[in-house]
Amino acid sequence: MNDALSIGPFTIPFTTLMAAAALAAAYIYIRYGTDFQKEKYKKIREEGLNILAAGIIVFLFGTVLLRLPAFFSDPLAVLSYPGGAEEMLLAAAVMMIYSVIQVKKHALDGAALFRVIFTMFIAAELIYHFFQPSAGDSTGSLLPFAAHPVSFYIITVGGIVLYWIHHKKGSLEQMVLPAVVIWAFSRWLIGFFDTVHTFFMVPVPGAYFWIPAAGAVFLYVFQRINKKQVTAWKS
């Protein structure tokens, strides 16, 4: 059975299609299952979706930028090359820069925007692993199952984090920062029970899971600086 969909010269792995479907389902969850369904958050939802779409496009086609010489010599081969850890890092950088630009341009609540994007990723990963379960390294004779149920671990952590984000009321540092740090540490730790650290089945260095935590800290500092500038301007 083929594990990829061929459209002309392009080859799209089914795991990528499943990830896209999971992200779409996660947006529906944001739109109808959270407090972001309110009309006052419409712009936040739209920009969150735009930023996510930009990240997906960069992940799928970032290989062109990373391998320009090869692209000029054999463009079809490069375009059919699946995205990996480097493309994912490039996508994260583009999403972070795009987020800052949109926050400044539209005077958006940066914490709310980060929460929307982070929630979509966590919900999507939970959905993805529910339908695409994976097992990790052997457990030996210590546990009743032969291999670590990595997907179960990820779903459990994702469920706890989603509950925290949507039921814990408070400021950015009280609500989002702890959730991001808990998720980053847990996903980094889970990787040691798997054959390799992965995100949506894409092998990545374990340090990649700390990127959202770094982004949350950057956002917190950015928000504080903005507030001080506004306060100084008003006084």
Q: What do the PLM-derived regions correspond to, one by one?
A:
Residues M1-S235:
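Hydrophobic, membrane-interfacing alpha helices
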